[in-house]
Curated annotation (Swiss-Prot):
HAMAP family: AceK (MF_00747). It holds the Pfam family AceK_regulatory. Bifunctional enzyme which can phosphorylate or dephosphorylate isocitrate dehydrogenase (IDH) on a specific serine residue. This is a regulatory mechanism which enables bacteria to bypass the Krebs cycle via the glyoxylate shunt in response to the source of carbon. When bacteria are grown on glucose, IDH is fully active and unphosphorylated, but when grown on acetate or ethanol, the activity of IDH declines drastically concomitant with its phosphorylation. GO terms for cellular component: cytoplasm. The gene is aceK. The keyword Kinase applies. It is found in: Cytoplasm. This is Isocitrate dehydrogenase kinase/phosphatase. Keywords: ATP-binding, Cytoplasm, Glyoxylate bypass, Hydrolase, Kinase, Nucleotide-binding, Protein phosphatase, Serine/threonine-protein kinase, Transferase, Tricarboxylic acid cycle. The keyword Protein biosynthesis does not apply. It catalyses: L-seryl-[isocitrate dehydrogenase] + ATP = O-phospho-L-seryl-[isocitrate dehydrogenase] + ADP + H(+). ATP binds at A324, D325, G326, T327, P328, G329, M330, K345. Belongs to the AceK family.
Length: 579
């Protein structure tokens, strides 16, 4: 696009803006790296509470540095903060600074965020933002990510794995490095026996160690004669010392490790885009936005999610946005494009009884989720502001519902609809529908995992509030995940009570409690009434997870959590652990 030259003073100002934004992103990136690098020490010293604090602090960095950059720019802009011609030239100068950078897309997203704050952009503004819906940004990345490569001679797999573990030293020694290597080798040979007599010919592992919760991961891939698979070695540092706990080679298992229902990894990567390219070779079906997000680059994940969705949206002009499958919510209106696996959630203007929270409280719940260890049970929900859709793309029923129920979030601009705030999540099959649709064995397994999901969340100080099946979904790996957060709270905030024994016939037959119930009172013995499970599945859940219905179990767990004693929740089944 040809730009009109600016007066010399304005040109210098545009150059200064570009330089200031560039330096602000570098400052952000340096602080991001500093926090991320602490993950190794947290792991070595078993400082799990410090690791949780770092995860929360790192998420807050982005908005902090955007705000700080706006303060820096006050002295440069001198009353020209909304001068479009100035920002157009600043974008040109900024782009020149990014030439040759692997992670220039991260820099561009930072710049876009800044301009949207200044201009309150509704939709996108191609004149002052970096917009490229028609490209896949990682396609231009050809520099290989830093990695270790190991050749494997027949019969010497254990020897090679001893060398691998030695190349990733920690301040705490391995409990028994050779024994760990031998256990990994046995599992690899067992998992890959169908590849032939000597299945592993070489191994590649990223130099950067990935950390999350209580584990460190060596992430890479292994090659046979004609094929390759992921290879992720999970390390733990517990009372037994530093040791290898598991090795994952199936793509489905690694995909669950990188699931967007988990918290972000702490991986101190020099550059991110080349790592995303590598990870995509392992997880070919994983959307690029989820990979950026799982590496802690949530804003870039949002950018890529927007880019890929709207590219698909424009390529299917006849398809309409419709209500998502499932029971309509009292707090949210949820819609989707049937051919694309996302849902868009808008807060209703008014909530039906018995919902009593405010709009601000609902937004606060969704913000809280970002600060929690989601342990594979809470679906990532990214907020988007001022999305623009053609009005004609909404089905009549959906448009009418949005106009009548979500007027505070909706406005019209000519032939377009603007959405002030919505939350975007991966689309899952609602659990209540899934249980009706599946054969008995699959439904039984899903019901049991639903119980396990509640237990996993509880052990990480998360209480879902509303346990109805419609608030849970099933992933493509048949895992139950919670995704409706308006009643979510912390276990440590609740009061878990026994249900009083009736003392009269009237109390026994009362439809409502005959005793005072506080706003945070929870009665686990009554959970079965609110789950909505068919009787056979409910009995199975009670048999497999009886503690869920025991008030004392919840009180004991609450006491542990208040002492910052969080039970460990491994991201894989016990059967996957090494002998």
């Amino acid at each position: 696009m040809n730009q009109q030259p600016l007066p010399p003073q304005s040109e210098r100002r545009a150059l200064a803006i570009g330089r200031a934004v560039y330096e602000a992103f570098q400052d952000y990136h340096a602080q991001f790296s500093q926090i991320t690098a602490r993950a190794r020490q947290r792991f070595e010293t078993r400082d799990w509470s410090g690791a949780r604090e770092d995860a929360v602090a790192r998420i807050a960095l982005y908005d902090h540095y955007i705000s700080e950059c706006m303060l820096r720019l006050r002295a440069v802009l001198l009353g020209q903060a909304h001068d479009r011609a100035l920002w157009m030239r600043a974008r040109t100068h900024y782009a020149e600074l990014l030439t040759g950078l692997i992670d220039q897309e991260l820099y561009k997203t930072f710049y876009n965020t800044l301009t949207r704050r200044y201009f309150r952009t509704q939709g996108v503004d191609a004149q002052i933002e970096f917009i490229a819906l028609d490209i896949e940004p990682t396609d231009a990345i050809t520099v290989p990510v830093a990695r270790h490569t190991y050749a494997v001679s027949p019969g010497r797999l254990t020897e090679m794995l001893v060398r691998v573990l030695g190349d990733y030293p920690f301040e705490v020694p391995y409990a028994h490095r050779t024994r760990c290597a031998a256990a990994i080798a046995v599992r690899l040979l067992d998992d890959l026996a169908h590849w032939g007599e000597h299945p592993v010919r070489s191994v590649e592992l990223l130099e950067t160690v990935f950390y999350r919760e209580r584990r460190a991961y060596l992430v890479g891939r292994l090659f046979g004669e004609h094929r390759f698979s992921p290879c992720v070695i999970a390390l733990v540092n517990d009372d037994a010392g530093l040791r290898a706990e598991a090795v994952l080679t199936r793509r489905s298992d690694v995909a669950q490790l990188f699931s967007n229902s988990r918290s972000y990894f702490q991986a101190d990567l020099t550059t991110v885009g080349d790592a995303v390219v590598f990870l995509r070779s392992l997880l070919t079906h994983k959307p690029i936005d989820e990979l950026y997000t799982m590496l802690g680059r949530a804003k870039q994940g949002k950018t890529e999610r927007y880019r890929t969705f709207f590219r698909h949206f424009q390529a299917h002009p006849a398809e309409q946005l419709v209500h998502a499958d499932g029971t309509p919510g009292m707090v949210m209106v949820v819609f989707t494009l049937p051919s694309y696996p996302l849902v868009f959630k808008l807060i209703r203007d008014r909530f039906a009884y018995p919902k009593t929270m405010s709009r601000a409280q609902v937004e606060g719940k969704y913000e809280l989720v970002f600060q929690l260890d989601r342990i594979g049970r809470l679906l990532d929900a990214q907020p988007y502001r001022f999305l623009r859709f053609p009005k004609a793309r909404f089905s009549p029923a959906l448009l009418q519902d949005l106009q009548s129920s979500c007027a505070m979030s909706l406005s019209e601009d000519g032939d377009d609809v603007l959405i002030a705030l919505c939350y975007v999540q991966r689309r899952l099959r609602p659990l209540n529908l899934y249980l009706r649709e599946q054969l008995p064995a699959a439904a039984h397994a899903a019901a049991l995992d639903y119980g396990q999901a509640i237990k996993d969340m509880a052990r990480n100080n998360i209480f879902p509030g509303d346990m109805l099946l419609k608030n849970f979904g099933i992933t493509r790996h048949q895992r139950a995940v919670f995704y409706d957060y308006d009643e979510l709270c912390l276990i440590t905030e609740c009061t878990f009570r026994d249900w009083p024994t009736p003392t009269s016939y009237e109390e026994q037959m009362a439809a409502e409690p005959w005793f005072h119930v506080g706003p945070r009172d929870v009665f686990p013995e009554r959970f079965a009434l609110f789950m909505g499970l068919p009787s056979s599945q409910l009995e199975a859940v009670k048999h497999m997870h009886p503690e869920l219905f025991d008030p004392q179990w919840w009180r004991d767990l609450q006491a542990r959590l208040r002492e910052d004693d969080y039970p460990d929740t491994p991201p894989y089944a016990d059967a996957q652990k090494l002998a």
